[in-house]
Amino acid sequence: KTPVFGMMERSEIENSKGEMEFMSYVHAMVVGNTKKDSLMPIISQFVEEGATVFTDELNAYNALGSMGYNHKVCDHGQLQFVVDGEVYTNNIEGFWSHFRRMITGCYHDVSDEHLQSYIDEAVYRWNTRKASQSERFSDMFNKSIGLIVTWSELKLCKVA
């Protein structure tokens, strides 16, 4: 099984009606393994020091507190899924559930060498889920101008 790592930013934003609305953004990627030495540099790259980080009980996350993060844990092994009403990992688990259904329902199976591309598609769909189809199309079109990806470049996307 190829390890995949994901992080989700949870925040509240003011919508067009002036109401506060929950929003979440995902970063996800194929990783070589789920050990501390692999995950901590990724977390440091995307998460500001001092931020509150909610995780499950994976040992690789134990160093987060000493790295300057406010680390809170849900220990699923102890059937702990919500702590103090705000510490939970349900949102990222919801993203993974959508990703698995996308693979099963649309693609049926994916190879390791193209897994990151499928993850990128799922992340894009999640992060733009509140946009209209025309806004999504326009955004994708604008981002693809000048972008040329050859088959041999795709074949280079191998898992480490």
Question: Where are the regions that the model predicts?
Answer:
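Residue-level recognition of single "structural anchor" positions
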Residues: 1-160
